[in-house]
From Swiss-Prot:
TRNA binds at W29, K33, K36, N37, N75, R77, R78, N79, M80, P81, R91. Changing W29F: Mild attenuation of toxicity in E.coli. Changing N79A: Attenuated toxicity in E.coli. Gene3D superfamilies: 3.40.630.30. It catalyses: glycyl-tRNA(Gly) + acetyl-CoA = N-acetylglycyl-tRNA(Gly) + CoA + H(+); L-lysyl-[protein] + acetyl-CoA = N(6)-acetyl-L-lysyl-[protein] + CoA + H(+). InterPro entries: Acyl_CoA_acyltransferase, GNAT_dom. Keywords: Acyltransferase, Repressor, RNA-binding, Toxin-antitoxin system, Transcription, Transcription regulation, Transferase, tRNA-binding. This is tRNA-acetylating toxin 1. Induction: Not highly transcribed in minimal medium, probably autorepressed by the TacA1-TacT1 complex. Part of the probable tacA1-tacT1 operon. It comes from Salmonella typhimurium (strain LT2 / SGSC1412 / ATCC 700720). Disruption phenotype: Both tacT1 and tacA1-tacT1 can be deleted without an effect on growth in cell culture; in a tacT1 deletion, transcription of tacA1 is increased 28.6-fold.
Amino acid sequence: MGRVTAPEPLSAFHQVAEFVSGEAVLDDWLKQKGLKNQALGAARTFVVCKKDTKQVAGFYSLATGSVNHTEATGNLRRNMPDPIPVIILARLAVDLSFHGKGLGADLLHDAVLRCYRVAENIGVRAIMVHALTEEAKNFYIHHGFKSSQTQQRTLFLRLPQ
């Protein structure tokens, strides 16, 4: 990741006030709810910071969830209960100053590896994401996610069994 720190759990020491990704809903969530959700255990948020600072350059957030068979792709439904257990990639955003530099892909890669490690210890079938925009949807498709049967911007990446 070079110009940023390794991913680490969000804490009160991280500076989020100046984070601007271009998606206000993601920026506001990080600034207003990120730490609260972390403390409550509702989601786990991981951040990367600009090198030698605590200023957040990007983040992603993971939570547990489930998806009904009707929304899942065919290969996820096979031999699975209804609903199917998943890990939700609830948010992923990169500060505008790092757009176009591969940081989003690096964060996604870290999130997927983290989810793989979780799947070795608990029963989850896939990573699920709700893309905010068509651009975000195309980003996830480019990285191997498959679209839902029924929800246009819901995508899945199957985890190994």
